[in-house]
């Protein structure tokens, strides 16, 4: 009975015809409304009082309201199933881009039987109809949201199937391995020894290496998509705001000789060597009785706790231990992988040391005001993040890396069961779980709530 209800729900969903504005809100020369579903062509013909133009050919039409009055005019394109984005009948109406006329046209389509599309519903239908896998569907949203040329190019590669191909190649190896293991379990009379010839162990290690290679590439794609949260911290007048301006390439923050000028956090989106960065300037860390400045310091510490990377700026001319401030305010977050020490105002020093390391921490000497050493700092930031994108880098998300991490965990368990315990059934179960985890990436094995969360983050018209 449950299966019948699930089938009916799926059937009813795709018997509806959906409509949405596909262009951004606001005024524009052209506004596009998209229809998809079994009644798309019928609804469009009622709207235009004419038959549709030939498939994939633009035709000029007038759009009529319920009283027969012309609401707008423009182009109509018809994409019959299955040769459309969604795999269903799709009609695109290209009229004028004013919000009033676009909303009026959309309301008219609803009167004619269309339903309002949910966020990401067009892409969801494309996924369900086999036009896209989950990685390609996500790449559409990533291409729209790309903040750099490199991110856009990587999103296009994922949309074209580069990431999916890598995952599917690993899955083929994993399925091949499972077949060998299952054969050894199902035909015990053949007395197949799991370790006799080392073949299964070699296949398992090959799969693990393949997953690791994809993980390395995906990490670069994740950095391109999600970027790095970088926080600048230090004492008042250490040159934090000057450093933000130098990295951003403009005077974003106010710079004065008065200590405590910066009292709130200041965020700036920039790109360093192609790596998207959210750069945050913070209030100077010191003891103060000023209530407003105290609140700024509290917010600064909160930003420090959440940062991917912290740039701790200190004044070289003071000769102080740069780590003393860190020990006082955020000792629990004092990790070499999250911290770069910045010795600033080197232009005021004669014969200043070019330190590359201070204790266990990376160190860079700069003059933010004079733009000395800034490129070396930029290189240090991207190197610290492990950012080394290749020409074939594809876009990736945190959930992809999480799925691969779980895949590796199950493969490690399978190896342990194989080598230590010779437990064939447990090896097979771990390999099954590894395949399920890896299949989540392309959507071959995905829970409904995961799909809803992914497509729910899309634009309405996608």
Curated annotation (Swiss-Prot):
It is found in: Cytoplasm. InterPro entries: G_TrmE, GTP-bd, GTP-bd_TrmE_N, GTPase_MnmE, MnmE_dom2, MnmE_helical, P-loop_NTPase, Small_GTP-bd. (6S)-5-formyl-5,6,7,8-tetrahydrofolate binds at residues 34, 92, 131, 462. GO terms for cellular component: cytosol. GTP binds at residues 237-242, 256-262, 281-284. Binds 1 potassium ion per subunit. Its EC number is 3.6.-.-. Homodimer. Heterotetramer of two MnmE and two MnmG subunits. HAMAP family: GTPase_MnmE. This is tRNA modification GTPase MnmE. The lineage of its organism: Bacteria, Pseudomonadati, Pseudomonadota, Gammaproteobacteria, Moraxellales. The gene is mnmE.
């Amino acid at each position: 009975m449950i299966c019948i209800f699930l089938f009916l729900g799926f059937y009813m969903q795709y018997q509806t015809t959906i409509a949405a504005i596909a262009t951004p809100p606001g005024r524009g020369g052209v506004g596009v409304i998209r229809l998809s579903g079994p009644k798309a062509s019928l609804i469009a013909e009622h709207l235009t009082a004419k038959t549709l133009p030939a498939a994939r050919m633009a035709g000029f039409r007038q759009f009529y309201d319920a009283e027969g009055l012309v609401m707008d005019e423009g182009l109509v394109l018809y994409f019959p199933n299955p040769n459309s984005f969604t795999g269903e009948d799709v009609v695109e109406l290209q009229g004028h881009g004013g919000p009033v006329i676009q909303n009026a046209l959309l309301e008219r389509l609803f009167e004619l039987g269309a339903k309002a599309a949910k966020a990401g519903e067009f892409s969801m239908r494309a996924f369900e109809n086999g036009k896209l896998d989950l990685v390609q569907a996500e790449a559409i949203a990533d291409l729209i949201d790309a903040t750099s040329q490199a991110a856009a190019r990587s999103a296009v590669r994922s949309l074209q199937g580069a990431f999916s191909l890598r995952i599917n190649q690993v899955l083929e190896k994993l399925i091949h391995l499972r077949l060998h293991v299952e054969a050894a379990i199902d035909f015990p009379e053949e007395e197949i020894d799991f370790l006799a010839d080392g073949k299964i162990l070699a296949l398992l290690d090959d799969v693990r290496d393949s997953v690791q290679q994809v993980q390395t590439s995906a990490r670069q794609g994740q950095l391109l998509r999600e970027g790095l949260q970088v926080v600048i911290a230090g004492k008042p007048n250490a040159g934090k705001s000057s450093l933000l301006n130098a990295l951003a390439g403009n005077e974003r923050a106010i710079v004065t000789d008065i200590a405590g000028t910066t009292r709130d956090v200041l965020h700036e989106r920039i790109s360093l060597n192609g790596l998207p960065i959210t750069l945050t300037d913070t209030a100077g860390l010191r003891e103060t009785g000023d209530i407003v400045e105290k609140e700024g310091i509290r917010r600064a510490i909160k930003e420090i706790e959440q940062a991917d990377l912290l740039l701790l700026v200190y004044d070289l001319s003071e000769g102080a231990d740069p780590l003393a401030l860190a020990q006082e305010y955020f000792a629990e977050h004092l990790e070499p992988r999250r911290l770069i020490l910045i010795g600033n105002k080197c232009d005021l020093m004669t014969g200043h040391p070019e330190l590359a390391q201070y204790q266990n921490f990376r160190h860079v000497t700069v003059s933010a005001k004079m733009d000395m050493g800034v490129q070396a700092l930029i290189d240090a930031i991207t190197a610290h993040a492990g950012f080394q994108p290749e020409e074939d880098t594809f876009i990736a998300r945190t959930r992809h890396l999480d799925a691969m991490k779980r895949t590796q965990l199950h493969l490690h368990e399978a190896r342990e069961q194989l080598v230590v315990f010779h437990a064939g059934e447990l090896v097979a179960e771990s390999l099954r779980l590894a395949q399920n985890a890896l299949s989540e990436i392309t959507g071959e094995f995905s829970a409904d709530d995961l799909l809803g969360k992914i497509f729910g983050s899309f634009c309405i018209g996608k």
